[in-house]
Amino acid sequence: MSRTVDPIDHLYQMVKDGISYGIVHQVAEDEYHSGRTIRIHDQQLINFGLCSYLGIEADERLKQGVIDAVNQFGVQYSVSRAYVSNRLYTELEDLLGQMFDGKHVLVTQNTTLGHLAALPVIIEPNDAVLVDFQVHNSVQTTLSQLRTKKVHIEYIRNDDMAQLEERIVALQEQHRRIWYLCDGIYSMYGNAASITTLESLLNRYEQFHLYIDDAHGMSWSGKHGRGFVLNQIEQHERMIVVVSLSKSFSAGGGAIVFPNFDLYHKVKSCGGPMIFSIPINPPTLGAAVASAKLHLSDELPALQNQLMANIRYFNQMAEAYQLPLVNATENPIRFIGVGLPKLAYAVVSRLQELGFYTNIAAYPAVPMRRSGIRITVTNHHTKEDILALIQAIAQVLPVLLREGGSSMDKLYKTFKMSNPDSLTMPANEEGRSSSAALKLEHHTSIQEIQSKEWNQLLGGRGFEWDFLHCLERTFENQPLPENNWAFHYYIVRDSNGVPVLATFCTKVLLKDDILESGEVSKAVEQLRVDNPYYLTSNYLVMGSLLTEGDHLYLDRQGNWQEALSMFIEELQAEQARCHANTIMLRDFSIHDEELAEWMKQHGYLSRAMPESNVLILQCEDEQDYVSQLSRSARALIRKEVLAFEHMFEVDIVTCDSPTPSEALIEDLHNLYLNVQRRKHDINLFALPQNLWSEMLKHPGWELLVFRIAPEHGGDPEGRPVGFMSCYKGENHYVMSMVGINSQYTESHHLYRQTFYQSIKRAIQLKLPVVHLGIDANKEKQRFGAATHATNVYYQTSDHYAYQVLDNIKANLGSALAVTR
């Protein structure tokens, strides 16, 4: 099964969820557009979803501009601008030039096509491009074209000026120019770019260039409405600003403001959409000309002041009613945090029932647990409208959070906001009160749990008490951070003290490409040469890196959903305490649709895990075992395993054996590293060298150490050529880690010999279930193993690493395409 996740699948599912709540794909039923209200499902709603912030979209002068243009030029002017332009284009660009203090302005069909026209032309193969993680999707759509030119592309955390400067310094010797692509006002949370800091970087680094999309800053800010960005600073000579004529400007199209004529003319002449796309139709141009004239008039400041008064009033009321306003900047986009998408859907739906139209902001536009209500403030709104909306949110939000198992306090923590000291909540506001019938225990050492009970719950799956105690002892006080694991054990009991749920998790530093393809991980490893902790973060992982299988004991006959909710809630609290970016719940059956739906509703994404391999032994001895294999497998084993078996000496090293020498432990570790360094499909840090000696302090562990006699081509000093570390459970045998000297893989079929001898050992111990681990499925199937497909459910608080990985994958794809 492919582990690749199609983002379209996630997006489509989120849209379908929105449709089921009746809050997306809706149709306005108004006979006439007023701006203040909208009719949906025969209900008149106050409209807080428009981006026409100044409220001039129904201005009579703009309407007359449309009428005049239609009367003069018809409804369409269907010819490429590369040949000829309607004269309204010239008039509009002249007026926009006046608005932008004499700069050269190119009108485009919309901002998206403007980006597609400009960026592939102005950015050259030897340039580097730094992309803000949150920059609008319309900007990011151009990156595929830039990759075909082999342009170097990296992502920067949202408005992280320190990271931006660090990358400018790092790239300036290898690249002629370094571009930063960002927004002026970001379209979800409404946060603003650090414009003055960007100006400082432009002044300090001659190779630095800025391309900024100020679509949401146009009209309501700045002299003549030139936008948020150019209201902060003068346009720099190495700075290009893109604005929208479709939002607050209230017409249609986009515009690019260039610092000089040469860039303007080059994009106009060579930009793909400028040559091949149909231009803006005359009615829209007529409205745009009328809007530009209004912007140049004395009326604009009053409109801007009116809107700013509404924005400030919204912020004041949100603070007064103690709402989680995520960003209190003064711009028309307001965002009230809610949490999980299902809660945001519920709040937006309930507000619609109460007479308010708002927008949902949910994954993938924002992180999964940081969904919310996106509200746009316009001049259509009265203070009474704004206050009524604030009061409605204050009424429904705590109630719906409580019903959904959350609370205002948890919400503030999710968004890393301070909870107002005077916050007062309705009775029982503190979220999901623990069910009287259930109680959760959280332990940080297996020694705090009775071994007999634990083994009854999970010991038979390979997670015995003694085994976990061994892991705790091994992965503490290590010199490297990736080898220090924190263990967490969870048990949920019913009123009689009987466990309904039990599991364990580890907090561990992982590589963020752990579930990516080997090709991607190899590319990331090249980037880790100078920084081994690049693209790594703390994870809370169900199970551990040395365990495999179903780690969750869940009594589905009991109150399992409530138990699971309590566990997840405590796990998320631990995530905040230990600063883990991702929760990863792994090894669940792909056929458990009920659990999959539960996970989806609680904001967990899923993807396929590498398939695991399990062998069920039903034989008396190894001869009987081989006889039960397929004909081709029998032939292969006889030819490449049994025919070489006499060449091998296999030592079984246990806790009762003499203590292995330091030299032997070092040899074994080097054999392990031979495999680990080439294994990128599950990209993990190397385990510590003392693991092997610690294993041998535990009666459940044993090492099968392989040597080849010198007369058969082995090491003349008798050094091992391979090993398999195995764990003996009550009824199972786990082949955990393997080490191989690759020199003997082809000549002596060493890899297959390690598998055969491990299975032979399980037969001798009369352990009927053999866990052969993940990957190399075809090879393991030859030995009779069956593959098991499982899912991992994960939730991350910050998607930056995944955006970077997507960029790496896209770069790899472009490189392959160019090669072909």
Positions of PLM-derived features:
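PLP-dependent enzyme catalytic core of the Aspartate aminotransferase-like
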Residues: E60, Q64-D68, Q72, D94, ...
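A conserved beta-strand-loop-helix scaffold within acyl/acetyltransferase catalytic domains
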Residues: S433-A523, Q572, T582-E746
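Acyl-donor binding region in acyl/amide transferases
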Residues: E476, A486-H488, D494, V500, ...
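Active-site phosphate-binding strand-loop segment of PLP-dependent enzymes
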Residues: E154-Y211
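Conserved PLP-binding catalytic core of the aspartate aminotransferase-like
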Residues: P301-R312, Y321-L354, A365, V377-N379
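Conserved PLP-anchoring active-site segment centered on the Schiff-base-forming lysine
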Residues: V121-N137
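Conserved N-terminal alpha-helix of the aminotransferase class I/II PLP-enzyme fold
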Residues: Q64-N110
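Active-site PLP attachment segment
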Residues: Q232-K266
